[in-house]
Structures are given as structure tokens and as C-alpha cells.
Amino acid sequence: MKEFFDGKKKVIGMVHLLPLPSNAAYKGNKDEIVQFALEDAKTLIDCGVDAIMLENFNDWPQYADEIPMESYTLMTAVASKIRDLCPIPFGVNIEMNAWHQEWIMAWAVNADFIRLEAFVDNRGGSFGYIPACSKRPCNHLYCDSWYSGDLVGGMGT
């Protein structure tokens, strides 16, 4: 991932999942979620983005620190399928700042990076209060994924 940040501007294409099973807007069709995400990823790759990130942006309310297991499991399955077809850097983001779940998912699917919304600063909003987590991920360097603070940069592993 270090070569990804060579000083040139990059475009990271976002694959926003449809609402996941723990969400009130979930329509009960996990195959539709998978297919929609794969089509988005293929389109982004075909359009020449530099990297892809998978995110559960359509889940409301967004939970602070972790998401329900049924959503996490389906999101991990989708991430694995996207990783299999993705020849460019691939990352995951779980709203809001589910750093530990993101780290484990990235490790499980061989993702290249994660995105953390509250890396060095505390955040508050409709999701509740999220303390900065910059010290906690450093204890989990057993995986090869790279992590990035929100709009701040990051550290290589």
C-alpha cells in the first residue's frame, strides 16, 4: 500500500451496500445486496478508479463501535466476493468507526486497508459518541492490512 501513496491524486470508488439485515430498510433479499455490490465494483473497476472501498453507508441508524452480527457476516461475504474480482487496492469501512470489526474483516478477506472515522479525534452525532481509537488498532498488527484515519493519512503495517 505504500506505493499507492506516491504523491499523485487517487480516486477511491465507493461501493455502498444496500441496507443490511439488521436494518429496518432491509428488503429480505441478500442475493440482491451481493449482486448490486458486485455490479458497482465491476463498474468502478471498468471506469479506472485507483482503489475500491466497501461501506455500509445505507444502514440507519449507524451504530458506534460495532454493527449487529447478521449485518457483519453478510458484509464480510460481500467483501470476500469483491476482493476476488478486484485487481486494485480494496478496503472496507463499517459505519461508524467499528475499527475492530473492520480490522478482522480486512484480515479475513485480504483487504488492503480500512477507513476509521474517529482515528485521532473524538466524534459525536446521531450515532452517539465515538472516542478516538488510534491506540487500539496498533495492538492488532497481526494482519497485513493498512489503516487510514479519516482524511488524515495513516500508517503502514
Can you name each region flagged by the protein language model?
Residues L17, H100, I104-T157:
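Conserved anion-binding
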Residues M75-A108, F113, R123:
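Glycine/small-residue-rich loop that forms an oxyanion/phosphate-binding "nest" at active or ligand-binding sites
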Residues G48-L74, V120-G128:
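Glycine-rich, proline-tolerant flexible connector loops at the mouths of alpha/beta enzymes
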